[in-house]
Amino acid sequence: MNKIILVLIFLLFGRYNIDAEPIRLATTTSTENSGLLKVIIPHYESDTGYKVYVISVGTGQALRMGQDGNVDVVLVHAPKAEKRFVKAGYGINRRSLMFNDFVIVGPYDDPAKIRGHNDLLRSLEGIANGKHLFVSRGDDSGTHKKELNIWQKARLKPEISWYREVGQGMARVLQMANELNAYTITDRGTWLVMRPKLSLDLLFEGDPELYNPYSIIAVNPARFPSVNYLGAMSLIAWLTSVKGQKHIKNFRLKGERLFFPTAINK
């Protein structure tokens, strides 16, 4: 039923909205840094006549903007926080959109000796036990939430002597890790964008714990009547349609596929 409603919204409020109210989309720095939105949003705008204003922040801040009614729709990657956002009545029509993954990067000489490990928790133990510098986003983003979660699962408590919370976006964190010869956890997309500028190496990948799902959620018009709910639902309908999912599937960075669509099982 939800899929039928989304299709109807897309058809009714599609290409005929030349003078439609712009859509305010709060999204993660990873979708912006990777270049994904710069590629696919123009296709949506061309198809529908809507203009999308993209606000690139961490997931925590994006959800807070939704809680304040300052945006129309959020595209984020922190499932537990997303569910709380919807349960509290701030968001509706949460839809699975796509996934990618996180990786651990660090110095080429890898003093923690995590290169080649097939166990994420052992890799974190190598960093913590050796007190090797680790740079954390520390910004309540989806990446930061994931990082804190895996430290907790490893039953490790980072110490101030080697752990740096910097309150910055992913690109800046990678730069700082590079300057400090430190380790960090990053989404793969931002890593690929930044890699040519860094002397870091990808040291760990592939653990199921590093799975990184993205959802898109409309801000609840019953709570904030001024939001552009029709625009938000139009964007959700397009991104989760066969056409939108194909654009996500076909997106490449340096020849590498970064995002895997999840809204349509094909």
For the regions a protein language model found, what residue spans apply to each?
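Serine endopeptidase catalytic core focused on the charge-relay Asp
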Residues: 104
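Acidic, polar ligand-binding/catalytic clefts
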Residues: 73-99
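Sec-dependent N-terminal signal peptides
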Residues: 4-13
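Exported/periplasmic ABC-transporter solute-binding proteins
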Residues: 21-47, 51, 60, 64-70, ...
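Sec/Tat signal peptide C-region and signal peptidase I cleavage site
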Residues: 15-20
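Short, conserved active-site loops that position catalytic residues or coordinate cofactors/metal ions
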Residues: 69, 100-101
